[in-house]
Amino acid sequence: MDNLKVKKIMPLQTGVSERGEWKSREVILEENDERIQYPNQYLVRFTADRVNQVDSIKEGDTVSCHWSSRVREYRTKDGREMAAQELNGWGVKKENV
């Protein structure tokens, strides 16, 4: 998706799981079109080696971003069935505006 404004870059998160070390970083992006009164916002998570791409952008930049969407289903402790959508980033670059 093109013409997105970087609204917020979240801190790097790291940890260790059964499969080894992991890292991720989330970025909040917003549609950058002045004609839209209420622009959509997207929370995109970059993981593993893709985390380094976030270093090339800063808050306020206009970027293009590519992601895949995944829905994760789960059950709460009280038994309710829930679902959450995740946007997994696989490419982000600053646009020449």
Could you describe each region identified by the protein language model?
Residues M1-V97:
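Single-stranded nucleic acid-binding surfaces, predominantly the OB-fold ssDNA-binding core
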